[in-house]
Swiss-Prot record:
One of its GO terms (molecular function) is double-stranded DNA binding. Belongs to the RdgC family. The keyword Coiled coil does not apply. It comes from Pseudoalteromonas atlantica (strain T6c / ATCC BAA-1087). It is found in: Cytoplasm, Nucleoid. NCBIfam families: PRK00321.1-3, PRK00321.1-5. Pfam families: RdgC (PF04381). May be involved in recombination. InterPro entries: RdgC. Transmembrane segments: none annotated. This is Recombination-associated protein RdgC. HAMAP family: RdgC. One of its GO terms (cellular component) is bacterial nucleoid. Keywords: Cytoplasm, DNA recombination.
Length: 301
């Protein structure tokens, strides 16, 4: 349940929605399994993995889960069967099979094999904090986050969001190393990516490296800027913070993840609820801290 990545978005307009409102809207787009001739389907499912509720509320945050099912039909399987059919037809007719005919044959093979193909399920989690004008998606790639937002926008009708950081904060991240201006609640770890500002410039990726070393200082003096940097924040989690404010490899500390261990293991729903309330509150607190640290403009229409 603990998020592994963060894509942070600012709501430019207040969303006046209750848990019941969101439930009703998501219920119009529920997940359903792939039909026999469908490559993929997508829809909303229970965040806690049981029951009919498509939204879980805790501490004023609404937890949502998008489920995708795909049929796994390897291209190699299709192409191998296509090659056999083309070879057989050419042997029988003595002439080459044209591209159009091959495409039609390929589509016929896909339609025949699809119902037999295995399916794979994947899940995208996120939450809305209307009181904080914040939307958070657990995604490492922009495409996955944008799909989540697009499906949410389709369901609720309007989702006026912009990235938390509208422009790169690479200069500020670089100053953390060049000017020793690291915020008090941030600890710099031993991983970073530095990039030259020149077109097709050099990229330096370092791991298990003292970022205060002379070697790193030389790269910075040569004009490279920080694109990604590993941090620990306020004894709450470690992560890789990017210049666009995306957060990857998020790992909450044991102190955090063990806070609710007093809840009986058999009461899984209560444990999930408590963990989500704790995690989402810390993510909101972190996002507010990012706004302060980088002086991000949070316009409201």
């Amino acid at each position: 349940m603990w998020f592994k990545n963060l894509k942070l978005y600012h709501l430019t307009q207040t969303l006046d929605l209750t848990e019941e409102d969101i439930q009703d809207k998501l219920a119009e787009f529920p997940f359903r399994p792939c039909g026999s001739q469908e490559l993929a389907t997508m829809g909303w499912t229970s965040p806690v993995g049981q029951g009919d509720m498509l939204v879980h509320s805790a501490g004023g945050k609404f937890w949502l889960t998008l489920k995708k099912q795909e049929r796994i039909l390897p291209a190699a399987v299709v192409n191998a069967e296509l090659a056999d059919k083309v070879a057989l037809m050419e042997a029988e007719t003595g002439s080459n099979v044209g591209k159009k005919a091959q495409q039609e044959m390929k589509e016929e093979i896909i339609q025949r094999l699809l119902p037999q193909a295995f399916t794979k399920n994947s899940f995208s989690h996120g939450f809305i904090s209307t009181q904080d004008n914040l939307v958070v998606v657990d995604a490492s790639a922009d495409g996955k986050a944008e799909t989540f937002l697009a499906m949410l926008r389709k369901a609720i009708g309007s989702l006026p969001v912009v990235p938390l950081a509208k422009q790169s904060v690479q200069e500020e991240l670089t100053h953390w190393l060049t000017d020793d201006s690291v915020p008090n609640d941030v600890v710099i770890l031993e991983e970073a990516e530095l990039r030259s500002m020149e077109e097709d410039g050099a990229i330096v990726r370092c791991k298990n490296q003292d970022l205060g070393s002379e070697e790193i200082a030389n790269h910075l003096s040569a004009g490279k800027t920080v694109q990604k940097i590993a941090i620990e924040w306020d004894e709450t989690f470690s992560a890789l913070l990017q210049e666009d404010m995306a957060v990857k490899r998020l790992k909450f500390t044991d102190v955090m993840t063990e806070q609710n261990d007093d809840i009986p293991k058999e009461d899984k729903l209560a444990k999930m609820d408590a963990d989500f309330a704790l995690m989402s509150a810390e993510i909101v607190r972190f996002s507010k801290r990012l706004v302060e640290i980088f002086n991000l403009q949070q316009d409201q229409e």
